[in-house]
């Protein structure tokens, strides 16, 4: 067998070993505490979908295999809207939802029929859920649900996590909670807590409520105000219906209502101020949103090793974080 000619040792190809793949977000976001479960809408988001099943004589609604699957499909569609909208905004960032549907496939028992009560009765059945999953404590519902969401974040290996409660309204006359409560239909507790929606609401509602989870404000009349501020940049709610600026006209937005909301949903757009509240702001127009577009340094030295034929670099890297200006939440950077 002929011998291959030996390569001339005076000439070597430079060999570069690739570093392991990195994403802009690759773990629990830097600086986030256990209660920081939804600071900006980027990366991987854990979603726990919960259905409650009333027991005994109070029951007027019953989940079926078909209705459960319909809910799962609608929720996925509503959240997919945000993925598609981000894709139109940026080619750099990613957004993925990781679902835990175990509490939807096997609805959680409750002593009340949620849709037949006022919306404020959520205190009863959300506490029953927290007890069911062994997450109920002497703390508030807000704290307990955030701790639960944090445990789900760890279990699902995501950056953020929140919970959705979908209420069965199939047999309800108007698909609304009983009169006398704070809300008639869907409502949310912002900053990585949870939202509640009757099953009969459209997919756009599920997209709208997710905006609240990541700090966006309502923009329709009687809800959010133009002087409200929230989100990582503490952005102002400029697209609110009550903006007094001369000549102001509301633009289509997922956080509005009526045709402004439905048109925004159809076009995969939202108001600039609502997008800023969820973290989607690119001040220098370089394609990277401000929250992740932060100064970084790389220092080190390198040399070619003639024995191994490899170039070896030894150094260190450091990165700063953008201050969290949110006037709500935990204020962790």
Predicted features along the sequence, with ranges:
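Subset of Sec-pathway N-terminal targeting signals
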Residues: 1-27
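Propeptide-to-catalytic entry region of secreted or membrane-anchored zinc metalloproteases
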Residues: 28-157, 193, 201, 299, ...
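Loop/turn elements at helix/coil->beta-strand transitions in domains of secreted/extracellular proteins
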Residues: 43-48, 158-163, 190-193, 217, ...
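Active-site-proximal beta-strand/loop segments in catalytic clefts of secreted hydrolases
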Residues: 50-55, 165-171, 199-201, 216-217, ...
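Auxiliary, metal-adjacent structural segments of Zn-dependent hydrolase domains
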Residues: 138-185
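Short pre-active-site segment immediately N-terminal to the catalytic Zn-binding motif
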Residues: 189-207
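Active-site recognition of the HExxH zinc-binding catalytic motif
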Residues: 203-219
